[in-house]
Amino acid sequence: MNDFATMDDIQTLWRELKPEEMSRAKELLTVVSESLRYEAEKVGRNLDQMISNSESLKNVAKSVTVDVVARTLMTSTDTEPMTQ
């Protein structure tokens, strides 16, 4: 199955990626797309079929995918977690 967004979508809708972000972003596109499919399946929906019937939903899925990937990339993974 195809991802709901592409690397070009990330760079167009968010920002140019740094070289060290490229491979992580590519993997995240698949993870996020599959997560959205899973959530739809949990409520008895086939997201790919729904998207094939609606250009608007296709764009929403793209937007959500880019947003989640961008937020994940902005989250630091090389520092200690904060504690109270």
Predicted regions and their residues:
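Divalent metal-cofactor coordination and adjacent catalytic microenvironments
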Residues: 1-84
